[in-house]
Amino acid sequence: MPKASELKKGFAIISNGKTLLIKDIEVTTPGGRGGSKIYKLRCTDLNTGARVDERYKSDDVLDTVEMNKRPISFSYIDGDEYVFMNNDDYTPYNFKKDEIEDELLFITEEIQGMSVVLVDGEAVAIELPSSVEMVIEETDPSIKGASASSRTKPARMPTGLVVQVPEYIATGDRIVINTAERKFMNRA
């Protein structure tokens, strides 16, 4: 059983009798001497789909749920459901648009390395690769000689995702984006 400080995004925990999937972790350090860090977990209740916020001290011990991961690829859209296919045995996994809204910002037809997270045989989440390649759909014109500058500008991707990119990047450039931090890494 891990401590709160050992938890990561994508883990499933049991808290107050509910099975929760961790979507985001925010760490705060209270002022004063000897204050332990506080971990604010933004979670989704796997039974109801409701959003739940939980707070724990760094040394609180939590129960985790056993999870399995299977490689998947995006298949098609059926109404408001997105269908993903297991790469090994072609099992379909359906997710409603609002369940995977954040992940959809990174999912293009050519994305590789996605996994479905299974808890008790049920698909509960999609795990993205650590980085994805995307083509910039719209950004301000590039500035010649700006490679020495550290200034950035917003760039919009075909999925609607907006990231800050260096000034020398232009519309149509293929870039690599860190999915966890939603930040530009480099040109592809």
UniProtKB/Swiss-Prot annotation:
Q: Cite a GO CC annotation.
A: cytoplasm
CDD domains the record matches: S1_EF-P_repeat_1, S1_EF-P_repeat_2
- Cross-referenced InterPro entries, in alphabetical order? Elong-fact-P_C, NA-bd_OB-fold, Rib_uL2_dom2, Transl_elong_fac_P/YeiP, Transl_elong_KOW-like, Transl_elong_p-like_YeiP, Transl_elong_P/YeiP_cen, Transl_elong_P/YeiP_CS
* Name of one Pfam family that matches: EFP
Q: Which GO terms describe its biological process?
A: peptide biosynthetic process
A molecular-function term among this protein's GO annotations = translation elongation factor activity
- Which HAMAP family does the record match to this protein? EFP
- Family per UniProt? Belongs to the elongation factor P family.
Q: What is this protein called?
A: Elongation factor P-like protein
Species annotation: Vibrio cholerae serotype O1 (strain ATCC 39315 / El Tor Inaba N16961)
